[in-house]
């Protein structure tokens, strides 16, 4: 678990580090797709469960992969997000997911970890 700041938000989202996940994801709600200048965009809210801080984002859709699940498959929306982990600011792909049933609102995958961070499973909050 590590604190991750979804910029420009001021409070961190506790996020699970998952070296098995290719793409990072974040708990988003009120997700609405729309078109702007002939391109696909999405508007969504991020709400920090710990602090109640809320921010409405509008992002261009980077891709929409189909994710296979046990009970079928679902299409996910992937956008580029600016995040801060420790002292490092990273622009990376995040899939927008309903993570309300999970303990952590964010999941940090290999797309952020590779070449930037070393994972030590014996530690938590190592970036603080």
Where are these regions (language model features)?
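Pepsin/retropepsin-fold aspartyl endopeptidases
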Residues: 1-128
């Amino acid at each position: 678990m590590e604190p991750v700041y979804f910029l420009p938000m001021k409070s961190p989202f506790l996020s699970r580090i998952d070296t098995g996940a290719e793409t990072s994801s974040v708990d988003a709600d009120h997700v609405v797709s729309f078109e702007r200048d002939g391109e696909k965009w999405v508007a969504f809210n991020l709400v920090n469960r710990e602090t109640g801080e809320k921010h409405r984002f509008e992002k261009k859709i980077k891709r929409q992969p189909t994710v296979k699940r046990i009970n079928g498959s679902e299409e996910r929306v992937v956008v580029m997000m600016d995040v801060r982990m420790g002292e490092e600011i990273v622009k990376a792909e995040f899939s927008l997911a309903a993570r309300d049933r999970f303990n952590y609102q964010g999941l940090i995958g290999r797309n952020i970890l590779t070449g930037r961070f070393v994972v030590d499973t014996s530690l938590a909050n190592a970036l603080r």
